[in-house]
Amino acid sequence: MLGMSHNRLQSQGTEHDKFATQKLFAIWGQIQSYLFQVELLKRCDPTVGVRMINRLKLNVLMIYYLEKKMVPALKEQREMNLTPLTYGLWLALRRAKLEGELLLDALCEFKDGGNLRDFFRKSMSMCGDCPYHSTVELDTYGGKVSTEIKFLHDVENVLKQLNYCHLILKADTVENFMVSLDNYLLKTLGSGSVVPPELYDPSQPCSVCFEELCVTANSGDSTHKRIVRKICDHITKQINIRVNSDDMVTHLPHATYVPDDKRTTAQTALDVIQSTMRDTTTENDSNISVSKAAAAALDAHNVFLPASGDLYAISELQFWIASSGRKLHQPRGNTVESFADNLEALVSKERLFDLRTSIVETAVFDRRMDHFERVFAQEIEHMNAADRLLLGGRAAAPDDIIEALIKACYDHHMSAPLLKRLLYPDEAAHDALKTVLERVSSHCIGNDIQCQDGDGTCGERMNETGHFRTNDSFAMSTTSLGHDEWLEMVKSASSDVARRRKMYAERLTKKSLASLDKCITEQRHELEKMLRVNVYGEVLIDSYTALFNGFRSRKRLLEAVKNCCANIIDNRNSDDAFDAHRFMQTSLLKHRIDPAMLPSLTHKFFQLVNGPMFSHDRHRFAQPSNTALYFSVENVGLLPHLKEEMARFMFHSSRKTDWTVSKFRGFYDFSTIDNVTAAHRMAWKYIKELIFATALFSSVFKCGELHICRADSLQINSNGDYVWKNGIYITYETEYPLIMILGSESSTSETQNMTAIIDTDVFSLLYSILQYMAPVTADQVRVEQITNSHAPI
């Protein structure tokens, strides 16, 4: 019965957590919707927003209420264990408060002053310096470093660098640094779901990009070679937007809130535009005009009139065009014609959309709205082509622009006459037909003679019988070989030349098209990432919360020890610590590390050096510690010689006694270090000393294995309390680098009987552990050592 009751309570707790999570997601979604509506109101005619001031005030008050209700709990959660959900909600809540107040103030000022440009400048923060440029500084154990943040990827890079340098950073310093990053994320991640194009650089890969390349087929290429071509879609994620410029025409008849007379007027105006477009749309294709001219020339001829050479050429070209089986404007079955219209067509579509919108606004609202893009139309017109593409449009989806750009590339490539003749022989026939018609027209105009009057004078190369005239030199040369033999030779040579030319052209065409396809395939991913609408991904929030919790756990561990442990031994102020240090150091240095233990000790070293951001060794399907460290060092671009040094660090001096580097109470002391790389090496040496000393302690004194853990490795239960486990916890703090927890197995939530030892010296800490585990043995061994040291020689 007790087991069933416990399971029922546990199930109820799980259901309660799920319900609370769902409510938080619902609130976050509503705040995101509110932020999106605020962004729309910023860009709309402020006269419309003025009519919504009362509703906007209610929303601002609701944000105040949510802030008062939720922020205390969110701050408490932040101190316990920050989650991506609570942090994202906290960002959105703070940003919604700022944006709502800003829009309300701008609308109130517009209501009093009525300046459109001032409203847009204030509501959209168009004045002043760029808010997305920030310089941040950080104090490490090896000195001060600074970096500039311009993109979201810069924030991710800084977080990866913090993760790698976590063992040479003080928690208080990082906490202030994380506040600076939080302010930057508040301006970006907190502003809504849509990312401004100037905020991301997709050519910079993120940690997820690198991890994806590590688990996918490499085709013989190295990871670093492939990552250069990687387009990041994790910091920001692109989405497909459906844009239909006819939505207004389709939905207007169903707009019941519009008066019937105004709706009828608007529909009538739209119908007039549609009919006018059908009447004025003409076929401007050059192929159609050429075909009409050719048909007129051929229809003017009859069997009673002699056919000139040019007329015969026109007839033959018409024959080949008709026999090709493809009608004009028939879709071609290749990649090129599967794309959308060209850029000019997109511009025309945008202008048509603006015309329709203006007519409907005038009919329904009796005025044309002064939206942002209309008030600043002159500035938008002066933008260059690249900025206009990034700006996008209201009538064309980003994919339409992308396909138009790609089609323009193909059209430019295929405008070469050679490619046109090979790919589209019927179009080559059209070009030839156009050339013949131009020659006939110019010749007839120059001689002031009608081409089809029957006198046979239009063809210079036609004789009186209507046949081709033979060149005299050609006739003389045929006398030696014979007419038929010479013609056969000319025909064979011409055929051979044509065949060779065609084979060469086909080979050239295949290579050029293959190169173009490869180039466009590679560039298409970048175009899609740049021009499509992007929303914020979860990478930054996940990375920020992981690092924040990792550094916060150091201070929280010390606070929890002071509150929960019944017995605290602080060796930092003990008078007997020096004797204990000398005794334990001398006892351990008599022994050597077993080489068979080095692989496991090396993995422990990797686990302690790795930061909190990459937790592959703590997943449900855990990987070795070197895998997590591999992602940590590769994502910061650690130099190869340092990676090699780190990989072999535990094997150096394993048979000697020079692995001890710290002085008495000098563990994790960096007072003599003046650069970051030297600080890293010193931290590695301290960690190596801790691992070797602990391993020798376990083997010499037979007290069982001592577990060495990071401060962020302790789990937290649903009440926010630590689930304590015995072990030595390294905090990477110079004031209290080592904390030993003992007796956790006998402690409960009601009674805390644990013992905690705080120290800045490895050997005095180990002696205190020996005293706790085997006090009689510790005193006996120490007395024997003192006696032997004072015995006469």
Curated annotation (Swiss-Prot):
Keywords: ATP-binding, Host nucleus, Late protein, Metal-binding, Nucleotide-binding, Viral genome packaging, Viral release from host cell, Zinc, Zinc-finger. GO terms for cellular component: host cell nucleus. InterPro entries: UL28/UL56. One of its GO terms (molecular function) is zinc ion binding. It holds the Pfam family PRTP. A zinc finger (C3H1-type) spans 206-234. It is found in: Host nucleus. Belongs to the herpesviridae TRM1 protein family. Component of the molecular motor that translocates viral genomic DNA in empty capsid during DNA packaging. Forms a tripartite terminase complex together with TRM2 and TRM3 in the host cytoplasm. Once the complex reaches the host nucleus, it interacts with the capsid portal vertex. This portal forms a ring in which genomic DNA is translocated into the capsid. TRM1 carries an endonuclease activity that plays an important role for the cleavage of concatemeric viral DNA into unit length genomes. Associates with TRM2 and TRM3 to form the tripartite terminase complex. Interacts with portal protein. This is Tripartite terminase subunit 1. It comes from Gallid herpesvirus 2 (strain Chicken/Md5/ATCC VR-987) (GaHV-2). The gene is TRM1.
